Amino acid sequence: MGGSVSPPGTGEGTLQYSLIMEHLVGDKRRPKEVIPGGLGGIPTPIKSEEQKMMERVMESCGFKAALACVGGFVLGGAFGVFTAGIDTNVGFDPKDPYRTPTAKEVLKDMGQRGMSYAKNFAIVGAMFSCTECLVESYRGKSDWKNSVISGCITGGAIGFRAGLKAGALGCGGFAAFSAVIDYYLR
């Protein structure tokens, strides 16, 4: 037998074990860094640099605007296809009112309406989200006033293409809609 293992009761094996434990656990072990009151008194570990970087990216105005643009495009496309599906005039030719439209014509009209709605919803979503993020960054607060201000700016910008009165109505209407939505979602 090898001479490295000592018989029980001599104490040499205990010494080796305690040296190994001291090396692995002793003063070489770092305590886990925690934030004392992170979640209402529950200690939470400190975030790594990668987590902090991802939070900064996801909280940026550009990311929020891009996310709202993509979400608006998808939602608008679905809404456009749905409204085209229930519209009785899809594929209708006013020159020949008695002709039944073909499936290809109906699908083409549904696709065109879906794409039109998708682009409009994407633009409005990106404008509103970016404006709200910029207003929130400027004010330094996250409350209902941000959505009302950004709703007014977005509605006004969309409405001013049709004139001053339309811009004022767009500002008021979009701000009121934003206030109602914010009231129910917060």
UniProtKB/Swiss-Prot annotation:
InterPro entries: TIM22 (IPR039175). One of its GO terms (cellular component) is TIM22 mitochondrial import inner membrane insertion complex. Disulfide bonds join C61-C133, C152-C171. It is a multi-pass membrane protein. Keywords: Disulfide bond, Membrane, Mitochondrion, Mitochondrion inner membrane, Protein transport, Translocation, Transmembrane, Transmembrane helix, Transport. It is found in: Mitochondrion inner membrane. Its main location: mitochondrion. The keyword Phosphoprotein does not apply. GO terms for biological process: protein insertion into mitochondrial inner membrane. The chain crosses the membrane at residues 66-86, 117-135, 162-182. Pfam families: Tim17 (PF02466). Essential core component of the TIM22 complex, a complex that mediates the import and insertion of multi-pass transmembrane proteins into the mitochondrial inner membrane. In the TIM22 complex, it constitutes the voltage-activated and signal-gated channel. Forms a twin-pore translocase that uses the membrane potential as external driving force in 2 voltage-dependent steps. Belongs to the Tim17/Tim22/Tim23 family. Core component of the TIM22 complex. This is Mitochondrial import inner membrane translocase subunit Tim22.
